[in-house]
Structure formats: structure tokens, C-alpha cells
């Protein structure tokens, strides 16, 4: 897939998520991020989730790590910013 197309799809997904959160979530609220990332990229995820309560779990084959981060956020914009920062990490999957 063309990187420009991928970026457009991601921007649209985050825009829709923000709309849903603004309509359904009362802020401040605790939010849980979950990402799966290759072991070689885990340090990048930890930087994005810095300051959160973090949990890491390695996959059974040891190639991937599931990283969760939990924190209280004051707005949907703060949450979307985390997703945007994470989206540039090679091989990341947001759950």
C-alpha cells in the first residue's frame, strides 16, 4: 500500500475515533492503550507511553511484545496524540 494512502486511512480512523469519544466519553477518564510490536521496536512504544502504568507481555515465539499503557486523560485530543505518535513505529498494531 502506498504510504500516502496508509496515512490517509490512519488519519480518517483517528478522526472517527475522536468523534465517537467526544460523543460518548466523559472526560477526564482512564484510557487503556494496547499495542503489539516487534521486540526490536518495543523501546519506541515505551517512549510513547512514558508516564503511564505499563504492562508488557512477550509472545510465545518471542518475536513480538504486547504493551499496554493506562492513564487518566483530560480530552480526546490527548488520546489521539498518543495514537499519532505510535503510528510511526515500524510494525506496530494498535488494538
Residue ranges and their predicted role:
Residues 65-69:
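Short, hydrophobic beta-strand segments
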